[in-house]
């Protein structure tokens, strides 16, 4: 057969049906249908989507992917005892004396979040940490944790 006899067809209607294409299944019924046909099914968790994910959310997604793919146990990140002690100490100092409830109200969060931070078991939340820094006037992030953010001038 020479090159003159062969016909080249281009377009979606003339595609050869070689292998089934990868598709995203949306719903239980489509998943069950694929299982009945004996197709290969792979599940992947999508951690961050589009513009909803900021810089910190992307890092969190990377951490979750690392946890998902590793076989050994990965400890979740916590604020630590140094931050917890700094919050407790400052909350009980004269001039800043307040209850956990009052601190939670001023930081626009719940009492349980404040309790977790004071225990040192809370996951580092930048929004809550910045609010606490503002209310308590101490640094809770960086190198000098517990130091005054804006020291009084002499």
From Swiss-Prot:
This protein's record includes keyword Nucleotide-binding: no
Keywords recorded for this protein, A-Z: Activator, DNA-binding, Transcription, Transcription regulation
Residue range(s) of DNA binding per entry: 100-119
Domain of life from the UniProt record: Eukaryota
Region of interest called Disordered, as start-end residue ranges on this chain: 1-23
Cross-referenced SUPFAM superfamilies: lambda repressor-like DNA-binding domains
The name this protein goes by in its record: Multiprotein-bridging factor 1
Gene: mbf1
Similarity comment: family membership: Belongs to the MBF1 family.
InterPro entries, A to Z: Cro/C1-type_HTH (IPR001387), Lambda_DNA-bd_dom_sf (IPR010982), MBF1_N (IPR013729)
Boundaries of every HTH cro/C1-type domain copy: 87-143
Single GO MF descriptor: DNA binding
Lineage of the organism: Eukaryota, Fungi, Dikarya, Ascomycota, Pezizomycotina
GO CC terms of this entry: nucleus
Record function comment: Transcriptional coactivator that stimulates GCN4-dependent transcriptional activity by bridging the DNA-binding region of GCN4 and TBP (SPT15), thereby recruiting TBP to GCN4-bound promoters. Involved in induction of the ribosome quality control (RQC) pathway; a pathway that degrades nascent peptide chains during problematic translation. Required to prevent stalled ribosomes from frameshifting.
């Amino acid at each position: 057969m020479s090159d003159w006899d062969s016909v080249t067809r281009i377009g979606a209607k003339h595609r050869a049906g070689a292998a089934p294409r990868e598709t995203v299944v949306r719903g239980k019924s489509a998943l069950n249908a694929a299982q009945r046909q004996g197709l290969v099914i792979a599940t992947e968790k999508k951690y961050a989507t589009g513009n909803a994910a900021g810089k910190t959310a992307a890092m969190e997604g990377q951490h979750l992917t690392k946890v998902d793919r590793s076989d050994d146990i990965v400890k979740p990140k916590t604020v630590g005892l140094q931050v917890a002690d700094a919050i407790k100490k400052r909350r009980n100092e004269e001039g800043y004396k307040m209850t956990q409830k009052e601190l939670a109200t001023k930081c626009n969060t719940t009492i349980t979040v404040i309790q977790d931070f004071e225990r040192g078991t809370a996951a580092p939340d930048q929004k809550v940490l910045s609010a606490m820094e503002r209310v308590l006037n101490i640094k809770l992030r960086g190198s000098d944790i517990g130091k005054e953010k804006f020291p009084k001038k002499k």
